[in-house]
Amino acid sequence: MMISAIDPRIKVASVSGALNLLQERMTLRHSCGSQIIPGLLKYGDYSEIGSLIAPRPCVWETGSTDPLIVPKWDEVFRDRLRKAYKALEASDQLHFDRFEGGHEWSGRVAYPLFDKVLKG
C-alpha cells in the first residue's frame, strides 16, 4: 500500500489483509505494534494513505476468518476509500474481495485485474 500510494509508476495495486486503521490498532491488546507509524494521526490514517492510490485500480482483499480484521473498523476504512475514489470519479477502479480464508493472500480478484491493466 505505501509504495503504491506515493509512486505514480505503479499502475495497479492489491492490498491484502490490511483494512485496519491506526486508531483501531492502538486500542487492541493483540496488536504487535509493527503497524504503528508515530504521528500519523496528525495527518490522517491508513485509509488516507490508501486513498492516495486513487484513481488507479486497486483491490483490497480480506479473508472471512482473518482475526486481525475488525468488522466495524474495516467498514470505516472501506467507506473512506469509497469517498476518495468517488471524489476522483474513479469508483469503478476500487475493488473489494472478501474471500474464504484467514490472514493470507488470495489474488482471485487481483490477478485478473493485474492482467487487464498491465497486459491490456
Language model regions located:
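Alpha-helical segments flanking ligand/cofactor-binding loops in enzyme cores
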Residues: M1-M2, S51
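Alpha/beta-hydrolase-fold catalytic nucleophile elbow
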Residues: S16-G17, E61, F99
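Short, well-ordered coil/turn elements that cap or connect secondary structure elements
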Residues: D7-P8, P55, E89-S91
